[in-house]
Amino acid sequence: MDPRGKRDKHRALLDAKLTELALFAKQLCPAASVEASTIRYEDEDGRVEVFPPPGIWEAEEERIELALAARSAQIFDETGLYIVCAVLDPTAR
């Protein structure tokens, strides 16, 4: 396979997994704002940032973060894609 075809295949897989994680985040917290990005930092392939609504309980925030981290780890094991997921303070946007 030519290098461009390999790169296109990698990008298509990355886009699919970012979409999967973003949809999963919305399932976990429908009221959250979710942003997915392919901007690379260091060794990561992409990132998903979740901004829950103000006033969410800390335990709920942690539940969302742990579920996303587990799914991201599973994706890494299956594909080698390193996608960072974070639940962030909505006022920090």
Segments from the language model and where they lie:
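A short amphipathic beta-strand at an alpha->beta junction
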Residues: 73-93
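Generic "edge-of-domain/loop-turn" microfeature
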Residues: 41, 55-57, 92
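Short amphipathic alpha-helix segments
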Residues: 16-30
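Short edge beta-strands and adjacent turn/loop segments
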Residues: 26-51
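N-terminal presequence-like segments and adjacent domain-start helices
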Residues: 1-16
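A short interface-forming secondary-structure element
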Residues: 46-66
